[in-house]
């Protein structure tokens, strides 16, 4: 399998795909693309990138092309036996499914106000007021999962899609 990603330091979507691939314990090769390169606008509109709407991460598994971090997590879960990224059943599975979907689709104000850079520290960074409800919701979501299922991961003892 090949996982095509941008730099994990700056791309939370690429980081999610890479974390899932690592946690799956399946063999994969990571290919880094420079989304800031001058030729990226042309590259992203052709080949496998066009199929993925010009976005990363992209997982290539034989003739199958999977894009979107949550779709990649689901694909890897099925390839690794169907129990790697989702709790078996019940409340933990319901929480993991809902939390992963919310984190995938939500928090737009937070994403716009706080671009990701894992290699920098920004003392005194003023967070936009529009992002504060998203930050409160992330805190609530994570606190709820840890308290309800006992940690150390969001739904208990094992890493799941919600943690990616």
Where are these regions (language model features)?
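GST-like domain detector, emphasizing the conserved glutathione-binding G-site
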Residues: 1-127
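GST-like fold's C-terminal all-alpha helical module
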Residues: 107-164
